Amino acid sequence: MSDLRETRLEKAASLRKVGKDPYALNFHPTHKTAELQSDHKDLPNGQDREIKVAVAGRVLSRRVMGKLAFFTLLDESGSIQLFLEKATLEEFDTSENQVSSFKQITDFVDAGDWLGVNGILRRTDRGELSIKVHSWKILCKSLQPLPDKWHGLADIEKRYRQRYLDLVVNPDSRKTFRRRALTVSAIRRWLDERSFLEIETPVLQSAAGGADARPFITHHNTFDIPLFLRIATELHLKRLVVGGFERVYELGRIFRNEGISTRHNPEFTSVEIYQAFADYNQMMDLTEELISSVCIEICGSTKISYQDVSLDLTPPWRRVTMQELVLEATGIDFDNFDGDQEKASSEMINLGLEVPSTADSVGRLMNEAFEQKVEPNLIQPTFVIDYPIDISPLARKHRCKEDMVERFELFIAGRETANAFSELIDPIDQRERLLAQQIRKNEGDIEAHSLDEDFLNALEVGMPPTGGLGIGIDRLVMLLTDSPSIRDVIAFPLLRPDSGSQ
């Protein structure tokens, strides 16, 4: 690698000697390569089209054949062949260099370099649309060679660590992140068109609330106080509803100091949406309409394939209670235990289910049974509704079912994609539940909710009936791009430090 780098440094010096700065100030492209490929499909083989074009991009490959050379140039939209002819370049070369323009580009320009070219269009005898280059400009001399074009980046870990190389050599990665950007834009546009306002809330917070999660902790030097990176946007968005914003959302980064897996990254993106005068039934309607609309815009249909499994995101989606699903999968009816935790635990153990020490109530035990026996099998979009109150301290009590709340989670392809409530607006009930969470925290539950007095004060000012929804953007993008790991859809995921790095 050091020898190759030294050779490229020598070529950069050679470019300077012939008056070409290897690190240019600018260039003015007139077209994207995809635009040229699309607009000139009718150009016959072996013919030129006298349309002047200027294109810039990275050289992916090069072949020199005597007085001819063929480069492949990649820009953001796609690629195109460059047709370089010694006689043509000399005809348009107005410089007085002793080294010809053709020799300069074939001797001093490598795969990986950024290049700007001017010329006309030509379709080769073999049918390849090309730019017949009249003049060229080196834009950036690359000192590092590109990965082998046939094998690319075989090391998946290296793809994540050096995403810039992955994007150069892997068109699927470029497609994934383009789709991610379009998905985010589509979600915002859908919400904006329905009178939702996006309002930013603090990333640094004095109390980490809104989710069962362990926060990252930092310190503010001027105030000499600890602060937390937000684990959710929920509590501040609810304050905005209290203040009179009836439809509000925020799409942004969330931080949780937790494990890493194919489904989890400590830094991720979510959108939280709050609608006054709505309940969880209306939020289910909103969820399936939003996601199906985005799916059509990004994929062209609500019927997609994910990891060789056909998914149909056409509304309406199945709505079923957690209790019904657990009964169906295990034969255990948690409605029959009447709070008897020991009996519920015993039945789970008899079925071979794990019973962690944190599952210290019938509701928590039912949730454990759900996660172990039901969740992985929820492939088609399914709203799982009516959750135990024990695990839902911010959701409103169910209008009919004791010890339950009006909450749903959306599952697609065996994983949670969204979470929503009829929001708890009773300040007395909310205080009691957060105090219970505080007791759990004091007993060592590091993921229990914090007591946020300012949030409770806001509820006492008065919050209208509200439906709230959170959607994991990364997991949604995984579905829309057929990506098996969350690290495939996050441009720069958090990785363990490379022991070989300097």
Swiss-Prot record:
<comment type="subunit">
    <text>Homodimer.</text>
</comment>
<keyword id="KW-0547">Nucleotide-binding</keyword>
<dbReference type="GO" id="GO:0006430">
    <property type="term" value="P:lysyl-tRNA aminoacylation"/>
</dbReference>
<dbReference type="InterPro" id="IPR004365">
    <property type="entry name" value="NA-bd_OB_tRNA"/>
</dbReference>
<dbReference type="GO" id="GO:0005829">
    <property type="term" value="C:cytosol"/>
</dbReference>
<dbReference type="InterPro" id="IPR012340">
    <property type="entry name" value="NA-bd_OB-fold"/>
</dbReference>
<keyword id="KW-0479">Metal-binding</keyword>
<dbReference type="Pfam" id="PF00152">
    <property type="entry name" value="tRNA-synt_2"/>
</dbReference>
<feature type="binding site">
    <location>
        <position position="416"/>
    </location>
    <ligand>
        <name>Mg(2+) 1</name>
    </ligand>
</feature>
<keyword id="KW-0648">Protein biosynthesis</keyword>
<keyword id="KW-0436">Ligase</keyword>
<dbReference type="GO" id="GO:0000287">
    <property type="term" value="F:magnesium ion binding"/>
</dbReference>
<dbReference type="InterPro" id="IPR045864">
    <property type="entry name" value="aa-tRNA-synth_II/BPL/LPL"/>
</dbReference>
<dbReference type="InterPro" id="IPR004364">
    <property type="entry name" value="Aa-tRNA-synt_II"/>
</dbReference>
<dbReference type="InterPro" id="IPR018149">
    <property type="entry name" value="Lys-tRNA-synth_II_C"/>
</dbReference>
<dbReference type="InterPro" id="IPR044136">
    <property type="entry name" value="Lys-tRNA-ligase_II_N"/>
</dbReference>
<dbReference type="InterPro" id="IPR002313">
    <property type="entry name" value="Lys-tRNA-ligase_II"/>
</dbReference>
<dbReference type="Pfam" id="PF01336">
    <property type="entry name" value="tRNA_anti-codon"/>
</dbReference>
<feature type="binding site">
    <location>
        <position position="416"/>
    </location>
    <ligand>
        <name>Mg(2+) 2</name>
    </ligand>
</feature>
<dbReference type="GO" id="GO:0005524">
    <property type="term" value="F:ATP binding"/>
</dbReference>
<protein>
    <recommendedName>
        <fullName>Lysine--tRNA ligase</fullName>
        <ecNumber>6.1.1.6</ecNumber>
    </recommendedName>
</protein>
<feature type="binding site">
    <location>
        <position position="409"/>
    </location>
    <ligand>
        <name>Mg(2+) 1</name>
    </ligand>
</feature>
<keyword id="KW-0963">Cytoplasm</keyword>
<dbReference type="GO" id="GO:0000049">
    <property type="term" value="F:tRNA binding"/>
</dbReference>
<dbReference type="GO" id="GO:0004824">
    <property type="term" value="F:lysine-tRNA ligase activity"/>
</dbReference>
<keyword id="KW-0460">Magnesium</keyword>
<comment type="similarity">
    <text>Belongs to the class-II aminoacyl-tRNA synthetase family.</text>
</comment>
<dbReference type="InterPro" id="IPR006195">
    <property type="entry name" value="aa-tRNA-synth_II"/>
</dbReference>
<keyword id="KW-0030">Aminoacyl-tRNA synthetase</keyword>
<keyword id="KW-0067">ATP-binding</keyword>
